[in-house]
Regions:
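Conserved beta-strand positions in the central sheet of alpha/beta enzyme cores
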Residues: 61, 94, 122, 144, ...
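Active-site acidic/histidine proton-transfer and metal-coordination neighborhood
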Residues: 15, 20, 47-49, 84, ...
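Histidine-acidic metal/acid-base catalytic patches
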Residues: 2-32, 37, 41-58, 164-178, ...
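Glycine-rich, proline-tolerant flexible connector loops at the mouths of alpha/beta enzymes
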Residues: 62-80
Length: 268
């Protein structure tokens, strides 16, 4: 039996599918789900890229330990990573520095960000925030203050109010990289935190935590981070930044990350 689909119809249909596939997720009302690469800290870069590719991940935040400032990485590490990621069709949109403590750290962070081709830097700083604001405004980059939980320690950025107070005197260049898991660990409602930070939100770390005052990660939807409500709130905000799935665990995370990404995409 002859097919009723002509060549012209086939070409038009294929072109339409390709055009649709090329539209970023957030352009069609979908949240932009990617990965925070600290999740793969036990793997080599090459093995990590294999797993990212298998999951169909297109955007990441570079947060692997060897790239953080306190480990004194060299330029070649970033050049090589950029080459490998580009070859795999994976975009690095943010670089996690950890603490920027002085001018040299800031200069290194800017240089490394350029080598990776990112548009945002995530980290923490206190005295350096005005210099970060000025320097990154000049470079056309943004900075997201990262909230964190440390057991037995008081950290500068635990609550959304801590972050907002730090942002009060800074330009819109500086905002928040909101880690919903760390907010939950510190006893704060992640959804409320996202609402309060909405106008300054640069990036989201999507992780679920077993219990307040703890650091044990669980699969998304299994803990106290209110992940479905978090995603609803990001939809309400029409958030266009990266929603970076993070899962901190020793040992193999391949199956875990497959479940994590599938869960996040279902809510995206």
């Amino acid at each position: 039996m002859r097919s009723s689909i002509t060549r012209r119809t086939f070409v038009k249909t294929a072109a339409g599918i390709a055009a649709t596939a090329a539209i970023p997720l957030w352009a069609s009302g979908k949240l932009n789900v990617g990965i925070g690469t600290y999740s793969y800290h036990n793997l080599s870069m090459d093995d990590m890229i294999v797993q990212l590719t298998a999951l169909g991940i297109k955007e990441i935040e570079m947060s692997r330990g060897e790239f953080m400032l306190m480990h004194h990485p060299g330029d070649d590490l970033f050049r090589t990573a950029r080459t490998k990621l580009d070859r795999a069709g994976i975009g690095c949109v943010s670089y996690y520095t950890a603490t920027i403590k002085d001018v040299q750290d800031l200069e290194n962070a800017v240089r490394f960000a350029k080598l990776l081709g990112v548009r945002n830097i995530t980290g923490d700083a206190t005295d350096m925030l005005p210099q970060i604001d000025q320097r990154l405004s000049h470079e056309g980059l943004t900075f997201g203050i990262h909230n964190h939980y440390f057991k037995g320690e008081r950290f500068a950025y635990e609550s959304p109010e801590d972050v907002l107070n730090a942002l009060a005197s800074l330009s819109k260049t500086v905002g928040a990289t909101a880690d919903v898991g760390h907010f939950a660990s510190c006893g704060h409602d992640p959804v409320d935190a996202l609402r309060k930070l909405a106008s300054r939100l640069k990036l989201v770390h999507l992780k679920d935590i077993e219990a307040p005052g703890g650091e044990v990660n669980v699969l998304l939807g299994k803990g106290i981070s209110r992940i479905p409500e978090v995603m609803q709130e990001l939809h309400r905000q029409s958030f266009t930044g990266l929603v970076a799935v993070e899962y901190e665990k020793e040992g193999s995370v391949e199956d875990d990350m497959r479940q994590e990404v599938a869960f996040a995409r279902k809510l995206a």
